[in-house]
Amino acid sequence: MRDTRRMAKTIEHQPERRRFEATLDGHHGRIEYRLGDGVMTIEHTEVDPALEGRGVAGGLVRAALEHARREGLKVDAECSYTRSYMERHPETHDLRA
């Protein structure tokens, strides 16, 4: 079981750079997006290979989707990882643009 509490503490929203960034054990991951017309378009998720399988990408997607929900945004998942995540999590379907 992954410790997502630790993960949540390492994710930082950088709105000026339009991304969320995670740092864990000196390694990084990020999710990049653009905004327009009430839609957050998630373009890309990238995680350092040293972090693969540790829940970092999922944590980044959750953070981005939670932000979209709080801000009243819909989500267009151009990123294949985000699209797959949303398909597997029905609680996110209402966010689809």
Annotate each PLM feature.
Residues 1, 51, 72:
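Short, flexible active-site loop motifs that bind/organize anionic cofactors or intermediates
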Residues 3-45:
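N-terminal first-folded block
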Residues 31, 58-60, 84:
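Basic, gly/Ser/Thr/Pro-rich low-complexity segments located predominantly at protein N termini
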Residues 53-64:
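Conserved acetyl-CoA-binding loop-helix of GNAT-fold acetyltransferases
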Residues 63-97:
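C-terminal structural segments of small proteins and small subunits
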